[in-house]
Regions:
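Substrate-binding cleft of extracellular glycoside hydrolase catalytic domains
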Residues: 108-184
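Aromatic- and acid-rich polysaccharide-binding/catalytic face
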Residues: 115, 121, 151, 189-228, ...
Length: 530
């Protein structure tokens, strides 16, 4: 079909027979597809339990922030009632907790004692000597005041990784603390930094290493993650004997972007944690799991993935990571209902299809549109952090609704208000396509230039790409050509840096290929119309 701003509809006569068979078949197919999509994502998986009412785990990282709090918001007041409730909950499954700072945590040892918990207390070491001195003094005070609760202390967390202190400065701080307390003293960092700075090891009483396969320079997928952890732990055990080794952080994220073969999900988090606990207890390793609760504030600096390492969510609800069946999307029936309602609304909006072929395509379009909007809305709830990100995501959802409305009316027997609405939408078809191309260019550039913490928004642009690839619209020739070239030029670099083992990146690249094809076809429509 040719043309850029108008389209001649093939109107089915009012007396013609409704194409019931193809329409019903397509509706059934769309229904099954939506059910299969959401059930496939959310189906429960049964794994061997890591924790039981009679078997507690060793230790978990604990930061006492509520879901609306962040250490970046100063001054900040910690909530004693929150800490009290947290410790009561964690005492059901853990023997000890690890903390990272002593600021405003003077009462934490008393609360821990009340609930039968031990503590590994950390002092936050930073590039500011005055702040570090306050932390060290507080650490010594807490350790000496509560020797029955504080079983070890950690002087600094990944300070060498952040390059905030030198190894020599760190050793001085460690020796300073060792001279004033009786508990064992250690320093905690990613395992590579112990190898890069061997001069720190003689100063500590035991070695504390962080093993996070997801964050490795060469990320390990869930299938190989435990093997990698075991190899590093064995290497350190042999290299530093007779000093003990504490795995100070290990875990897996439940949400966020894929890194090579490492895929964040609730099921993968449960697989890793349960498998690791079994392996650690079989080998007699000391360990601390990261972390007790999801920390939304970490998304500011680490993207969506940073906020979802908890064994419980930010509302202190069990994520089923330690025991019981686990689902990647526990509320999948809700998303299924939303998608079905959206698909039904699209069918009602379109009304009577204009031909038997349209009767087959219309329900499928409605299902694809409902799936894309639902998937992107679910992603938005996970990734959006600021007002600007919420507005951007909201604009993309509105754009998808407009494109779905346009596409549905393309297949409709239009009369009355449907004809008027279609004419308004179709006369602006070039605008909807250009806006889709602009969004694609912005997100593609971000994923090429600053990809580390960004998720792949494939669902946001798949519907516009498909609709305008199948039914091209002309207009804005110069802008469309520029957007097509820009997106197309970024596809190969984006895939190269993500590697072909990243199926999320491949999905985004394929979406962009479809979008570029739609943009390119619109240029041909313009040329034909001229």
């Amino acid at each position: 079909m040719r043309g850029s701003t108008t389209i001649r509809a093939r109107i089915m006569p009012a007396t013609s027979r409704f194409p019931t068979a193809p329409f019903a078949f397509a509706c059934l197919l769309g229904l099954l597809a939506l059910f299969g999509l959401w059930y496939g994502i959310g189906q429960p998986v049964t794994l061997a339990d890591a924790a039981t009412p009679t078997h507690k785990l060793q230790c978990a990282s604990y930061t006492p922030f509520d879901k609306d709090q962040s250490p970046f918001d100063q001054p900040m007041q910690l909530r004693p009632e929150r800490m009290e409730a947290d410790l009561a909950l964690l005492a059901e499954r853990f023997e000890c907790l690890r903390t990272y700072s002593v600021t405003d945590l003077e009462e934490l040892p008393n609360m821990a004692r009340k609930h039968g918990l031990k503590l590994i207390v950390g002092a936050w070491v930073s590039r500011n000597p005055a702040d570090t001195a306050v932390e060290i003094a507080g650490l010594v005070k807490i350790a000496n005041a509560h020797p029955d609760v504080v079983q070890a202390v950690i002087v600094g967390n990944e300070a060498l990784l952040r390059k905030e202190v030198t190894p020599q400065q760190l050793v001085v701080l460690i020796e300073q603390v060792k001279a004033q307390i009786k508990q064992p003293v250690t320093y905690a960092d990613v395992w590579e930094f112990w190898l890069k700075h061997p001069e720190v090891a003689p100063a500590v009483d035991f070695i504390t290493i962080h093993l996070l396969p997801y964050w490795e320079d060469n990320p390990a997928g869930i299938e190989n993650a435990l093997h990698e952890v075991a190899e590093v732990r064995q290497t350190f055990g042999n290299a530093y004997a007779p000093k003990d080794i504490l795995i100070g952080e290990t875990g897996w994220p439940s949400e966020g972007r894929q890194r090579e073969t490492a895929v964040p999900s609730l099921v993968n988090q449960a697989k890793f944690i349960r498998g690791f606990v079994a392996m650690a207890e079989q080998n007699g390793w000391r360990y601390n799991l990261i972390e007790a609760f999801d920390q939304p504030w970490k998304r500011v600096s680490e993207g969506a993935v940073g906020g979802y390492w908890g064994l419980y969510d930010a509302d202190r609800q069990d994520k089923s990571i330690l025991a019981g069946p686990v689902s990647n999307l526990p509320h999948w029936p809700t998303w299924l209902m939303i998608s079905l309602a959206l698909a039904a609304a699209a069918l009602l909006w379109a009304g009577r299809p204009h031909s038997p072929r349209a009767a087959l395509l219309l329900p499928l379009l409605a299902a694809v549109g409902a799936a894309c909007i639902g998937l992107f809305a679910e992603l938005t709830l996970v990734t959006s952090r600021y007002v600007g990100e919420w507005l951007w995501a909201g604009a993309l959802i509105v754009l998808n609704l407009v494109v779905l409305s346009h596409g549905a009316l393309l297949l409709s027997s239009r009369n009355g208000w449907r004809a008027r609405t279609f004419n308004w939408l179709h006369s602006r078809g070039a605008l909807w396509l250009t806006l889709s191309g602009f969004a694609g260019a912005v997100m593609m550039l971000a994923l090429v230039v600053d990809a580390r913490y960004r998720s792949f928004p494939s669902a946001a642009l798949l519907l516009p790409a498909l609709v305008y690839l199948c039914r091209p619209v002309g207009g804005y020739r110069r802008e469309v050509a520029l957007l097509a070239l820009l997106i197309g030029a970024c596809i190969a670099p984006q895939l190269y840096q993500e590697t072909l083992s990243n199926w999320q990146a491949i999905g985004w690249a394929m979406t962009c290929v479809l979008l570029v094809a739609a943009l390119w076809r619109s240029l041909r429509v313009k040329a034909q119309a001229a």
